[in-house]
Amino acid sequence: MKFVLLFGVLLVTLFSYSSAEMFDDFDQADEDELLSLIEKEEARKDCIPKHHECTNNKHGCCRGHLFKYKCQCTTVVTQSGEETERCFCGTPPHHKAAELVVGFGKKIFG
């Protein structure tokens, strides 16, 4: 009888320890996921929206529906005759075509 009782206590202790480890793993995974989401949200807040100037930060454009916007630059001649480069975040033509095809496919195939 003592052996069965001792074995039962040992079994309950091991089960308790393993379930505590499992819950710790779940908590750690939740914390990691939450930190990842917070980092993504901060990066999203720091990004440059579509049609806004990106002359000083050419890699900081936000994401669109499918693709990240690209910094597109043009040379502008000012009234004083100086040429300056002006850049804005936009969707390149090949990305627009891909989004059009995907949108069309979604309408057809539901």
Swiss-Prot record:
The keyword Chaperone does not apply. InterPro entries: Spider_toxin_CSTX_knottin, Spider_toxin_CSTX_Knottin_CS. Keywords: Disulfide bond, Knottin, Secreted, Signal, Toxin. Expressed by the venom gland. Its main location: secreted. Residues 1-20 form the signal peptide. The presence of a 'disulfide through disulfide knot' structurally defines this protein as a knottin. Belongs to the neurotoxin 19 (CSTX) family. 03 subfamily. This is U1-lycotoxin-Ls1kk. The lineage of its organism: Eukaryota, Metazoa, Ecdysozoa, Arthropoda, Chelicerata.
